[in-house]
Amino acid sequence: MPTVAYTRGGAEYTPVYLMKIDEQKCIGCGRCFKVCGRDVMSLHGLTEDGQVVAPGTDEWDEVEDEIVKKVMALTGAENCIGCGACARVCPSECQTHAALS
């Protein structure tokens, strides 16, 4: 049975939590990051080989020349409250959400 939450007005809804971001579909626009105040995701680099690398790390310094685009990465899934705001603003539909059971 999925988790049920309530609005302030008492209406029931089922939170859908961010489970995954498809780095191949993500365009790195940052819209999801802007609407989420919970530190659920952050901007990373994607290399030619498909490796997702966090900025400011030793790994980033090693592969910086190989980064082909910047993408959002799920870095704080435990902070997601299941509101779905990120999905509503995503133009590339690169996120997977699911209810908890």
Curated annotation (Swiss-Prot):
Record has Transport as a keyword? yes
Location of the 4Fe-4S ferredoxin-type domain: 17-46, 70-100
Keyword annotations from UniProtKB, A to Z: 4Fe-4S, Electron transport, Iron, Iron-sulfur, Metal-binding, Nitrogen fixation, Repeat, Transport
Report the cofactor remark. Binds 2 [4Fe-4S] clusters.
SUPFAM superfamilies tied to this protein: alpha-helical ferredoxin (SSF46548)
Task: List, in alphabetical order, the GO biological process terms annotated in this UniProt record.
Answer: nitrogen fixation
Q: Where does [4Fe-4S] cluster 1 bind?
A: C26, C29, C32, C36
The record describes its quaternary structure and partners as: Homodimer.
For this entry, the protein name equals Ferredoxin-3
Organism whose genome encodes this protein: Rhodobacter capsulatus
The lineage is: Bacteria, Pseudomonadati, Pseudomonadota, Alphaproteobacteria, Rhodobacterales
The protein's gene is named fdxB
